[in-house]
């Protein structure tokens, strides 16, 4: 099911998602009618922070946090901006990034020894996904909430 299929049809005509979530990823997605807002949030030059909760298999490199903080380069030469990794347990962590490249979180985790088994975006800028919000549900927020 597509995201916009979940919303009332009278709203869908003017709305579009800001960024994207992969099919196997869940979590926070901003939907707007404001193109400037969309550009601001998705532009790498804005350095908007996005935080993910990750469950993974494998053993992270001893230097995983340091490597993330310095930025990574994959085998194809793709550069990833510095990110912040917070270990929660031996199989879960939080990762905060400031860009949104294709499968970026999965690719970065792979570079430090982890294979992502579950991925959930929990924060964009100052907007935090309410824990009690069910999949497919939504809340309204103001532009002020994002820009503050």
Where are these regions (language model features)?
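Basic, flexible Lys/Arg- and Gly-enriched helix-loop patches that mediate nucleic-acid binding at interfaces
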Residues: 1-148
